Regions:
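Non-catalytic peripheral regions of nucleotide-handling enzymes
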Residues: 1-78
């Protein structure tokens, strides 16, 4: 299940920092960006913008914005 995450954005809407338990971490590099739209035929469609990010502490993380709500989440795999 995705976990809510606080994100700082640049003017183009791309994440530049994420809030972690220890405070804000800067994004060093945008590794990948893609969008997905699904379930458009239902009452609860899905529209998300995904960003794979390299953080200043060396971790790679994937976050997405629910484009219908505007909320941001960390995507966990596995």
């Amino acid at each position: 299940m995705p976990r809510s995450v606080a994100v700082r954005l640049e003017s183009t809407g791309v994440p530049v920092a994420l809030r972690r338990n220890s405070g804000w971490l800067d994004v060093v590099e945008l590794l990948d960006r893609y969008r997905t739209e699904d379930r458009w035929w239902t009452e609860r469609p899905v529209s998300r913008a995904y960003y794979e990010l390299l953080l200043e502490d060396g971790r790679t993380i994937t976050v997405f914005q629910d484009e219908l709500e505007g909320s941001w989440y960390e995507q966990k795999y596995g």
